[in-house]
Amino acid sequence: MTPELLIIKGNWALEAQYYYMNVSRKDGFRNYQAHGAYGIVRTLLIGSRYNYSHADAGVATPAKGSLELVLGYNYTDASDKKAGIRAGIMNDINCTLNYYINSWMLARLRYSYTNVHDRDVENLLPKRHVNTIEARLQVIF
């Protein structure tokens, strides 16, 4: 079950999704369940407006020369105590700047704060937060 929401209005867009997963396990192991949700608000700082892509079922790639600001939040609960799996609960807040060089390439600068807790994975701390800054050139296929 993964309901999605997409609203496009001029140079603003809102995306959100809830996801749920159930893994049937064999040999007497209990089924594993995980779930989460994310939300993204995006706006074109330079560029005219967003369009909908029927082929991609989402926001179309903005025009060449567009500069986009994206704010996002993600929550994922990969721990299922009934199944005996404590893979962690993650909260991630991020801010991204995308510059669309052409219709096939973009430059991206992204900051993310990620907090993970409630995990019991070998060689990993049970609680951790990470600040990440990344820059990349991305080819869109």
Regions found by a protein language model. Give the residues of each.
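Outer-membrane beta-barrel pore domains
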Residues: 1-141
